[in-house]
Amino acid sequence: MTELFDTAVTSLLHLPEVLDRLGAAAGDRRSAGDHAHHAAHGHGQHRISGIGGGAPVDIMETPGEYAFVLDVPGLSKSDIQVTLEEDRVLVMKSSNGAGNGKRKREEEEGECKYIRLERRASPRAFARKFRLPEDADTGGISARCENGVLTVTVKKRPPPEKKTKSVQVTIA
């Protein structure tokens, strides 16, 4: 009976990961509450469209830039790739072999052996793509990883100057 209980508890502990994977497979990470908020506040059209799913990303906009913030615990600078595809698609992903979800097993010393390994496998692989808006300056992209948080900043181009042209009115 204890083994059955342990299995049930372990399954429940991994439920958030399973739900994350299901949301990623569906390609949409927003909750029902998020959908309701966006519909109620007229945010139906996003300036930045996400492609695919995966790790949660916060996207912020200021007058001068866009910022993408993603948790990447356990990954080093060499494990993270940030690229630009098709001139307007920002790609953030873990490089080959990094974030495969398998934790390196500590060496058993002497007569010590593992009875159970339950700590969450870390780091997790991730891949996210975002189509950037027209005002994004693709030459002004920078990425910084600090304390397990990746921040990718995309500068905005200044808005085009509005040109006014006078048209002479003729009397017929």
Swiss-Prot record:
A GO cellular component annotation in the UniProt record: cytoplasm
Domain sHSP, first and last residues per copy: 48-172
Region (Disordered): 29-54
GO biological process: protein complex oligomerization; protein folding; response to heat; response to hydrogen peroxide; response to salt stress
InterPro entries, alphabetized: A-crystallin/Hsp20_dom (IPR002068), HSP20-like_chaperone (IPR008978), Small_HSP (IPR031107)
UniProt KW Thylakoid keyword: no
PROSITE patterns assigned to the protein according to its UniProt record, in alphabetical order: SHSP (PS01031)
Residue ranges that the Swiss-Prot or TrEMBL entry lists as coiled coil: none
Cysteines paired by S-S bonds: none
UniProt KW keywords: Cytoplasm, Stress response
Cytoplasm found in the keyword field: yes
Family membership: Belongs to the small heat shock protein (HSP20) family.
Assembly and interaction partners: May form oligomeric structures.
Name used for this protein in its record: 18.6 kDa class III heat shock protein
